[in-house]
UniProtKB/Swiss-Prot annotation:
The keyword Lyase applies. One of its GO terms (cellular component) is 3-isopropylmalate dehydratase complex. This is 3-isopropylmalate dehydratase small subunit. Gene3D superfamilies: Aconitase, domain 4. Pathway: Amino-acid biosynthesis; L-leucine biosynthesis; L-leucine from 3-methyl-2-oxobutanoate: step 2/4. The gene is leuD.
């Protein structure tokens, strides 16, 4: 996993509440098992007319000025619903690095973190300010300082210390285990032969 320390990008507002994992990535695309390639299916039912890959020009992701946005500003209860990790894969593959919401579905929140993204909880007052940013306005997210720095103000956010450590150091669960490789190897040397 890549380290996440300070990230600067532009935002796209999608302020709907209760965007569930089936809206983020519909069930018909869950057959794939590689993390890559899901971005084209992100918000499929909203991005495309008649579900035929004809872009709906009214959907915010399809507007030219928002196509390169990497920070999503959204509503409450983002990622509720089924526990499909594919939804986080789709967000990451599309290019999102940060999702700022009023709240998250618990499993989806962890799935975003496990995939190197930073989900941030902010109250509606902050999200309404961020929603007003121009498509070219840059926002910096400083994980170490736990700050969002934008043209409309600076805002602090909370994150669990263990997740913060993992992101700052680019560690997933396997990476953390590998930090103890020497100790594990030494322990295995002293195990009874019937366990080896």
């Amino acid at each position: 996993m890549e380290k996440f320390t300070i990230y600067t990008g532009t935002t796209v507002p999608l302020m709907n509440d209760n965007i569930d994992t089936d809206q983020i990535l519909p069930k018909q695309f869950l057959k794939l098992i590689d993390k890559k390639g899901f971005g084209k299916y992100l918000m499929y039912s909203w991005r495309y007319k008649d579900n035929k890959y004809t872009e709906d020009p009214d959907f915010v992701f399809n507007r030219p000025e928002y196509r390169k946005a990497t920070i999503l500003i959204t509503g409450d209860n983002f990622g509720a619903g089924s526990s499909r990790e594919h939804a986080a894969w789709a967000l990451a593959d599309y290019g999102f690095k940060v999702v700022i919401a009023g709240s998250f579905g618990d499993i989806h929140y962890n799935n975003e973190l496990n995939n190197g993204m930073l989900p941030i909880v902010q109250p509606i007052e902050v999200r309404r300010k961020l929603e007003q940013l121009k498509p070219t306005d840059e926002v910096t997210v400083d994980l170490e300082q736990q700050k969002i720095i934008s043209p409309v103000g600076e805002f602090t956010f909370e994150i669990d210390g263990e997740w913060k450590h993992k992101l700052l150091n680019g560690l997933d669960d396997i990476g953390i285990t590998m930090q103890y490789e020497d100790l594990i190897t030494e322990y295995e040397k002293h195990r009874p032969s019937y366990w080896q």
